[in-house]
A protein has these predicted regions:
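Helix N-cap/coil-helix junction residues
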Residues: 73, 102, 107, 244-245, ...
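Residue-level detector of structured alpha->beta connecting loops
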Residues: 47, 72, 172-175, 243
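ATP-dependent carboxylate activation and anion-phosphoryl transfer catalytic cores
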Residues: 222-297
């Protein structure tokens, strides 16, 4: 099978090479294409049998998926609409609420309160943003601040108004997301497959980058197992509600009483040491095995 891996200059070496090497072991012909170099015309001419989009590329927001749908070229991962929804936390939660209402069930996961601010608003209303966030975000400081730049950036945790202002100023050209921070165990849950046939892999503790310890969840094995099952159920329901396909990574927080949803990655990193790769390894799977299985479906 002729497979095209779509990547940009920033993730070409790591993400794209990981995917190419994995698929080549399945005896596929794999070529990496730069999405910044007339990618639509190139794909229209080459007509690969399948495309795979490297994490961190424009596929995070569904742009590349929509182009592939237009060209009628199959691709791994979720469709453009699901990617757009999962990239926006507020729309994700709205979709999840609609799903729960339609299924006549109770909401299994509680969202973290978050707000997005444009670069223009930060530049002109910085003090007001700080005041309103202090009034509206439950629990007060700390907050999480993340740039809205196209490339993925680290999240900054701010402890007071001064640090908050500094973090906002650093995002004056990009805009930012400000999110409630809660004490708890932060986990990344990898999900493989589509719909009701999807499988949830062991939750990964983000602090340790290792399988979450039952002892960290509760001193009682029975209670800890129940909490882990609830975390896995929440991840499964999020993917089902958002219509995610093939693979996803759901970031959750167990705050000691309930599961809170932080964000969803429809296009997770497959690189060695990533949460998705660690989850696969924990479950006895390999990235090459997972990708080649999905390609053959």
């Amino acid at each position: 099978m002729n497979i095209a891996v779509l990547a940009d200059s920033q993730n070409h070496s790591k993400e794209a090479e990981t995917i190419r090497e994995a698929l080549k072991k399945g005896d596929h012909t794999v070529e990496i294409y730069d999405v910044d170099q007339q990618i639509m015309a190139t794909l229209k001419a080459k007509r690969p049998d399948l495309c795979c989009i490297a994490a961190g590329t424009e596929g995070d927001t569904g742009v590349l998926q929509e182009m592939l749908e237009l060209l009628q070229i199959p691709f791994l991962g979720s469709g453009s609409e699901s990617c757009r929804i999962s990239a926006d936390e507020k729309i994700s939660m709205f979709s999840l609420l609609r799903y729960v209402e339609a299924a006549e069930e109770e909401l299994a996961v509680e969202p973290l309160v978050s707000f997005k601010f444009s670069a223009k608003l930060i530049a002109s209303e910085l003090d007001t943003i700080v005041q309103v966030c202090e009034e509206r975000i439950p629990g007060g400081y700390p907050y999480e601040v993340r740039s809205l730049a196209p490339e993925k950036t680290a999240t900054t945790t701010v402890q007071d108004s001064k640090e908050f202002k500094d973090a906002l100023k650093a995002c004056e050209k990009t805009g930012c997301l400000v999110r409630q921070w809660v004490e708890g165990i932060r986990v990344s849950v990898a999900v493989l497959g589509t719909g009701w046939d999807a499988h949830v892999l062991p939750p990964i503790d983000e602090t340790e980058n290792a399988p979450v310890s039952l002892a960290a969840l509760s001193s009682s094995d029975e209670v800890a197992q129940a909490i882990r099952s609830e975390i896995e159920r929440c991840a499964f329901e999020v993917c089902l509600a958002l219509g995610l396909r093939d693979f996803a990574l759901v970031r959750l927080v167990w705050d000691g009483a309930q599961v809170r949803m932080a964000e969803v990655e429809a296009l997770p990193s497959f690189a060695e040491g990533s949460a998705f790769e660690v989850a696969c390894k924990t479950a006895g799977l390999s990235i090459e095995g997972v990708l080649n299985h999905l390609v053959e479906l």
